[in-house]
Amino acid sequence: MIAWLDEDEPFPPVEQALTEPSGLLAASADLPVSRLVTAYRRGIFPWFNPGEPVLWWSPDPRMVLYPAELHVPRSLEKVLRHRRYTVTVDRAFGSVIRACAAPTPARPASWITPEIISTYSQLYRLGLAHSVETWIDGQLAGGFYGVMIGRMFYGESMFAQAPDASKIAFAHLMRRFAGHGIDMIDCQMHTAHLARFGGREIPRSDFVATVNTLTAQPAPPDLWRWSHCNEPA
């Protein structure tokens, strides 16, 4: 049994999350911005399928990536050096989140519902959600979006319409984070893709303790003011 959250009702302690399905903590009827921000500060995130109530999760263990430990595969390193592309931030948030929501042959129904798009677009207007875009020949080719509270970044979803396009954006942002002292990003659940970049699982208690520390610290003021244009000879 999980908690049903009425309006303004607080989240239960994350230690009450189920072990099966791993991390399921609570459910609610809607997804207001205020509750979403509170969730991130508590180490909780929403994930639900179309037609379901909003389900809130805090799995144990938790997948994270430390930007200073980023591993870029050799094949991607060659792409970063030799392909012509431009990486930008916060230039096309709406296009990025809609592209992440688009159905694919492997995923005909996306968890990124119109309600998710609306709420995260509000976070973007508040300066809390961000997008990173890869452009090839002037066209949006890939990217991802996430949420940043203080010095804590929470990755959400990515897409690619050209080979390696989302990986290019991801690698550049992680190196930017490493250079600006951003210690940890939340990857939510284990995937082989993130593990190849150096992601690893840590105990939920360690994750929540780090989140409490990092969300209370201000992010560097110029963190999201950059772009990169790669023009190999």
Curated annotation (Swiss-Prot):
<comment type="similarity">
    <text>Belongs to the L/F-transferase family.</text>
</comment>
<keyword id="KW-0963">Cytoplasm</keyword>
<dbReference type="GO" id="GO:0008914">
    <property type="term" value="F:leucyl-tRNA--protein transferase activity"/>
</dbReference>
<dbReference type="GO" id="GO:0030163">
    <property type="term" value="P:protein catabolic process"/>
</dbReference>
<dbReference type="Pfam" id="PF03588">
    <property type="entry name" value="Leu_Phe_trans"/>
</dbReference>
<dbReference type="GO" id="GO:0005737">
    <property type="term" value="C:cytoplasm"/>
</dbReference>
<dbReference type="InterPro" id="IPR004616">
    <property type="entry name" value="Leu/Phe-tRNA_Trfase"/>
</dbReference>
<protein>
    <recommendedName>
        <fullName>Leucyl/phenylalanyl-tRNA--protein transferase</fullName>
        <ecNumber>2.3.2.6</ecNumber>
    </recommendedName>
</protein>
<dbReference type="InterPro" id="IPR016181">
    <property type="entry name" value="Acyl_CoA_acyltransferase"/>
</dbReference>
<keyword id="KW-0808">Transferase</keyword>
<dbReference type="InterPro" id="IPR042203">
    <property type="entry name" value="Leu/Phe-tRNA_Trfase_C"/>
</dbReference>
<dbReference type="InterPro" id="IPR042221">
    <property type="entry name" value="Leu/Phe-tRNA_Trfase_N"/>
</dbReference>
<comment type="function">
    <text>Functions in the N-end rule pathway of protein degradation where it conjugates Leu, Phe and, less efficiently, Met from aminoacyl-tRNAs to the N-termini of proteins containing an N-terminal arginine or lysine.</text>
</comment>
<keyword id="KW-0012">Acyltransferase</keyword>
